[in-house]
Curated annotation (Swiss-Prot):
GO terms for molecular function: D-arabinono-1,4-lactone oxidase activity; FAD binding; flavin adenine dinucleotide binding; L-gulonolactone oxidase activity. Residues 17-187 form the FAD-binding PCMH-type domain. This is L-gulonolactone oxidase. It holds the Pfam family ALO. It comes from Mus musculus (Mouse).
Length: 440
């Protein structure tokens, strides 16, 4: 008999969203997941599955039953010939990497945070950068999913293909993802090179940068022309690191947090802070090399609010210059650094922000120094307006103000996804307030 807990308070990593589920379950087997869903049907309860809790939105929140998949975290099979690995959906990427290392395998692309579950990564459309690479879910070759009625579907391109096309970005609303099979590549090392540039230079030579580096991204420092360009590419170099406690923590975290807190009383400081920290930390070339997963992952030190929309790649320059012009025209609107700009190959996953188009993701951020919220509404709304103007689609895990009407315009396959969702979960067991805004 599956055991549930009362009185559990759930908070996401950034402590920006939370909820009090009526019951909190940590199943250890498929049978126990089935028991939870049977109880939910009997008592007419909503169910949400939660992974690492990193989503900066209320996508995982519920006052019904919450299922934490952390105890279903095994590697089930490694197929060395096909270079594929099958895992339980609750495994954290941080725990998967050393297992893949043992077999000389790696994932070809990863997001910045690995303290997340495989089921959650695909559910929210997690991405990184590189025009040869899709969002992380494009590495999924098969999955199993338990429907609201307790039956299990095996999904791949050759079995339940429609559900597979939807479930690779499932939003937690199709069922409980039980297992995922990932396509891997041989283990590889990456060399990361970062160097200073200007916004004009990077936008004028965007195609050249995209061709030069397999995993290219750049950071723009609002209220300035400053840019840090980051290349990541395959290497045979020995592992080396450019990290340094004094610069990374004493300056890059403790001093920055204090100055950002000060700027909540003196907002005009923000532009100066952005320029000062570019000069301190990003004004020279740096190199580091290591196993791919150690280079892809970096430590998020700050609690934060973020938005991250995907626009057609060819609109990058126009959209970024419009964001810059908006900030120049409204000096009272302040923006923390960086605006992170990444690039992703198009795909055929129904609710992927990169559905049928190569995309540019433009991530904006406002930190919460010492847990204090900084006024961001004007910046947020102006950014959303610009993103919508250029055909943007918001990252599913991150907060946004879009509703069904918006998604119907953004996603050619939106109605197809809705039909699949209604077939798999006719009573709406897996919905919550976030998803009701999406679908109703």
């Amino acid at each position: 008999m599956v055991h549930g807990y009362k009185g559990v308070q759930f908070q996401n990593w950034a402590k920006t969203y939370g909820c009090s589920p009526e019951m909190y379950y940590q199943p250890t087997s498929v049978g126990e997941v089935r028991e939870v869903l049977a109880l939910a049907r009997q008592q007419n309860k909503k169910v949400k599955v939660v992974g690492g809790g990193h989503s900066p939105s209320d996508i995982a929140c519920t006052d019904g039953f919450m299922i934490h998949m952390g105890k279903m975290n095994r590697v089930l099979q490694v197929d060395k010939e096909k270079k594929q690995v099958t895992v339980e959906a609750g495994i954290l990427l941080t725990d998967l990497h050393p297992q893949l290392d043992k077999h000389g395998l790696a994932l070809s692309n990863l997001g910045a945070v690995s303290d997340v579950t495989v089921g959650g990564v695909i559910g929210s459309g997690t991405h990184n950068t590189g025009i040869k690479h899709g969002i992380l879910a494009t590495q999924v070759v098969a999955l199993t999913l338990m429907k609201a009625d307790g039956t299990v579907l095996e999904c791949s391109e050759s079995s339940n293909a429609d559900v597979f096309q939807a479930a690779r970005v499932h939003l937690g609303c199709l069922g409980v993802i039980l297992t995922v099979t990932l396509q891997c590549v041989p283990q590889f090392h990456l060399l990361e090179t970062s160097f200073p540039s200007t916004l004009k230079e990077v936008l004028d030579n965007l195609d050249s940068h995209l061709k030069k580096s397999e995993y290219f991204r750049f950071l723009w420092f609002p209220h300035s022309e400053n840019v840090s360009i980051i290349y990541q590419d395959h290497t045979n170099k020995e592992p080396s690191s450019a990290s340094n406690w004094f610069w990374d923590y004493a300056i890059g975290f403790y001093l920055l947090e204090f100055l950002l807190w000060t700027s909540t009383y003196l907002p005009r400081l923000v532009g100066w802070i952005n320029r000062f920290f570019f000069w301190l930390l990003f004004n020279c070339k740096k190199e580091s090399s290591n196993l791919s997963h150690k280079i892809f992952s970096y430590e998020c030190r700050f609690k934060q609010h973020v938005q991250d929309w995907a626009i057609p790649r060819e609109k990058t320059k126009e959209a970024l210059l419009e964001l810059k012009a908006m900030l120049e025209a409204h000096p009272k609107v302040v923006a923390h650094y960086p605006v992170e700009v990444r690039f992703t190959r198009g795909d055929d996953i129904l609710l992927s922000p990169c559905f049928q188009r190569d995309s540019c993701y433009m991530n904006i951020i406002m930190y919460r120094p010492y847990g204090k919220d900084v006024p961001r509404l004007d910046y947020w709304l102006a950014y959303e307006t610009i993103m919508k103007k250029f055909g943007g689609r918001p990252h599913w895990a991150k907060a946004h103000n879009c509703t069904r009407k918006d998604f119907e315009k953004m996603y050619p396959a939106f109605h197809k996804f809705c039909d699949i969702r209604e077939k798999l979960d006719p009573t709406g067991m897996f919905l919550n307030s976030y998803l009701e805004k999406v679908f109703y």
